[in-house]
């Protein structure tokens, strides 16, 4: 029994076990320490080698920096060259307009505009059709004035010119609306002769590409006739009994443009930036003048030496004079070259200032808006303005002995006040209910969400959301129905940043001097083709379905193209205030500008794409994908490289788009470069680089403008 019992461990044995365990622990700790020290030494050695390699690469980059920047400067001459071509085209256009003598004014000349406006004011008794025809000229002039304000580099725009152009725009807008009012009065005076045989009331629809007029005159005053629907449309009104029994006319003037909202302020560069650019230009001018004066001095010295030799030796005089003439001729040529260089330098600075302004974020948020007031920096009006008016029916034309007699009212067409200012004589509370209105959304406008109906507050000079109720929208029929407390201008608005931030983007070559820019958003995929100085909407996809737009297939210069896309509801163009309304991946403006300029330079032979790592690097750096793209076969098997660019340094990253974590580590066997051009040159074919060097300057400038306008690196 005692043998079955467990043997008792003695104190000495227990101490021995503890000692062995302690020795084992100390040995393991020592081994771990030695292993850690070894690993740490290896890590530090690797770090030292990497640091040395990094410093060597930095030194090499610094050594060739000036050379690379000089080469980039020569390539970037395409931007001032494109600007010079644009200016020459503008002058040629002005000259053609001058020799045409077609009677239309030059919108940039105040005297011509004032004469045009005065002459049209004097013209009376124009029919609606005549005003519509004239409106085409007026709208074209307004468009030209807006383009002048947008296309002229900010440094070249003087305050007095801005005021002049904006005043001309406002005068034309006001006069055009006044003319439509007078033409409506002339039309309504003939209401009785245009009456419908069935209803006895007058109904008229006049359609044009820019304006649509719907007018209804209540001649019979039938209290049961309260539903007004214009023929072959669902557009109309449900009017209350009091209006159905009154001498009134209801007018819906749908202008496919917005002349009600205030004009957008013209962006101008900050004083600090303007002064910096001015100083740069002044320095260049001084340097050039010094160089020219030095040459003149040298020429005069040569002439003095020549005259001295004349006195000594007549034979040598002729030879010396010949030499002097040659030298003077070459000096003149050099002087001309210096002047040309100075002009290009000034143009280059002007273009750079304008480009930087496109990516500048405003430091101040737009003024505070009270409840129900629309902030037009956050929202945009779409589809034009619907001018809704209840008018007093003017005296009708009456046939008397072969003559048409009509009473002419001095005050002209009068609006019918509804509801009246005093309602004491009316007993029932709901004697003046809101008027139900049904409108058709313009066919060329895309709403990604149900449109919001707003009304114009003439007193406060802004759009408001109150006073409108029971709004419903039928997307298939494109009809919006709502109830309106009082008549006046109404419009439809949409969040201006509904397609921002973008989900992804890609820029790839299509042909010689032709690229395709694809921007993918939550709601749509927009494809834009760019060639020479033109842009075209290639396609729109809505929820994987192709959408047909009137803009597709139409080539336009960049600024009119951007305006057309915005007016169609396809806004992928941030403003200087957009960062207040969109969560963005903000980048330093100068880094953005440098990246877009150099991407544009390479765009004829290289494709660029969105990278998720651009979100994880700081605001002083941008990351994007790039690959050589000479044939469509490149699209099938894309082999993207990841580049990081800080404006002063470009490097190829070791990580891939599919990697798990972000790292700025350099890809093996690659180097730093001061420009993107020299970075891609390391892995590009000679054919690709030759294609880049022979790119059309207008094409490069257009691609750059589109990149600056979409701000893909900050808004993706």
UniProtKB/Swiss-Prot annotation:
It is found in: Cell projection, Cilium; Cytoplasm. Its main location: other. The keyword Ubl conjugation applies. One of its GO terms (cellular component) is cilium. Coiled coil: none annotated. One of its GO terms (molecular function) is microtubule binding. Keywords: Cell projection, Cytoplasm, Ubl conjugation. Ubiquitinated. Ubiquitination leads to its degradation through the 26S proteasome. Ubiquitin-proteasome-mediated DNAI7 degradation occurs in mitosis. It holds the Pfam family Casc1_C. InterPro entries: CASC1_C (IPR022110), IC97/Casc1_N (IPR031826), IC97/Dnai7-like (IPR023247). Part of the multisubunit axonemal dynein complex formed at least of two heavy chains and a number of intermediate and light chains. Interacts with tubulin. Associates with microtubule. Via its association with the multisubunit axonemal dynein complex, is potentially involved in the regulation of cilia function. May also act as a cell cycle regulator. Belongs to the DNAI7 family. This is Dynein axonemal intermediate chain 7.
């Amino acid at each position: 029994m005692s043998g079955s019992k467990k043997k008792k461990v003695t104190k000495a044995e227990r101490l021995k076990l503890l000692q062995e365990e302690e020795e084992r622990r100390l040995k393991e700790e020592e081994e771990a320490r030695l292993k850690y020290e070894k690993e740490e030494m290896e890590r530090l050695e690797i770090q030292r080698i990497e640091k040395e390699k990094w410093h060597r690469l930095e030194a090499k980059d610094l050594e060739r920096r000036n050379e690379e920047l000089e080469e980039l400067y020569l390539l970037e001459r395409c931007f001032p060259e494109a600007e010079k071509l644009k200016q020459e085209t503008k002058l040629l256009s002005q000259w053609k307009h001058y020799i045409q003598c077609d009677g239309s004014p030059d919108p940039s000349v105040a005297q011509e505009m004032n004469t045009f406006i005065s002459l049209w004011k004097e013209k009376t008794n124009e029919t609606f059709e005549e005003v519509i025809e004239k409106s085409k000229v007026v709208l074209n002039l307004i468009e030209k004035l807006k383009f002048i304000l947008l296309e002229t580099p900010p440094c070249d725009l003087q305050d007095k010119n801005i005021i002049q152009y904006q005043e001309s725009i406002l005068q034309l807008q006001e006069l055009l609306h006044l003319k439509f009012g007078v033409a409506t009065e002339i039309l309504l005076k003939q209401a009785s002769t245009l009456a419908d045989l069935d209803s006895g009331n007058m109904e008229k629809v006049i359609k044009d590409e820019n304006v649509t007029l719907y007018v209804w005159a209540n001649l019979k005053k039938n209290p049961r006739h309260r539903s007004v629907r214009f023929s072959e449309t669902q557009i109309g009104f449900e009017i209350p009994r009091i209006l159905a029994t009154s001498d009134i006319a209801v007018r819906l003037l749908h202008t496919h443009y917005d002349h009600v909202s205030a004009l957008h302020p013209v962006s101008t560069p900050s004083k600090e930036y303007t002064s910096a650019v001015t100083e740069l230009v002044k320095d260049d001018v001084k340097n050039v003048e010094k160089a020219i004066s030095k040459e003149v001095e040298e020429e005069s010295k040569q002439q003095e030496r020549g005259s001295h030799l004349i006195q000594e030796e007549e034979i040598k005089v002729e030879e010396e004079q010949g030499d002097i003439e040659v030298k003077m001729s070459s000096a003149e040529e050099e002087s001309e070259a210096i002047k040309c260089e100075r002009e290009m330098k000034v143009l280059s600075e002007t273009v750079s200032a304008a480009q930087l302004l496109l990516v500048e974020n405003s430091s101040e948020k737009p003024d505070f808006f009270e409840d129900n007031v629309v902030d037009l920096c956050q929202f945009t009006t779409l589809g034009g303005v619907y001018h809704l008016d209840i008018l007093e029916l003017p005296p009708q034309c009456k046939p008397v002995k072969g003559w048409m007699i009509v009473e002419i009212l001095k005050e002209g067409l009068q609006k019918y006040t509804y509801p009246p200012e005093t309602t004491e004589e009316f007993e029932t509370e709901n004697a003046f209910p809101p008027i139900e209105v049904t409108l058709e959304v313009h066919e060329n406008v895309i709403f990604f969400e149900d449109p919001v109906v707003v009304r114009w507050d003439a007193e406060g000079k802004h759009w408001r959301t109150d006073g409108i109720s029971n709004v419903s929208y039928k997307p298939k029929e494109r009809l919006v129905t709502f109830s309106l407390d009082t008549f006046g201008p109404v419009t439809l608005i949409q969040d201006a940043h509904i397609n921002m931030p973008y989900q992804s983007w890609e820029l790839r070559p299509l042909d010689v001097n032709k690229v395709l820019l694809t921007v993918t958003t939550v709601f749509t995929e927009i494809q834009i083709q760019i060639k020479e100085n033109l842009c075209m909407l290639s396609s729109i996809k809505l929820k994987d379905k192709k959408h047909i737009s009137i803009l597709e297939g139409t080539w336009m210069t960049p600024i009119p193209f951007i305006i057309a896309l915005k007016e169609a509801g396809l806004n992928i163009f941030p403003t200087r205030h957009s960062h207040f309304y969109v969560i963005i991946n903000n980048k330093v403006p100068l880094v953005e500008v440098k990246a877009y300029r150099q991407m544009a330079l390479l765009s004829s032979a290289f494709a660029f794409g969105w990278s998720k790592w651009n979100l994880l690097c700081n605001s002083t750096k941008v990351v994007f994908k790039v690959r050589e793209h000479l044939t469509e076969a490149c699209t099938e098997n894309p082999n993207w490289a990841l580049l990081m660019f800080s404006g002063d340094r470009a490097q190829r990253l070791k990580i891939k788009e599919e990697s798990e974590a972000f790292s700025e580590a350099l890809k093996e066997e690659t180097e730093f470069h001061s420009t993107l051009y020299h970075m891609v040159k390391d892995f590009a074919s000679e054919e690709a680089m030759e294609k880049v060097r022979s790119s059309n300057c207008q094409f490069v400038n257009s691609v750059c403008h589109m990149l600056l306008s979409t701000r893909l690196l900050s808004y993706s």
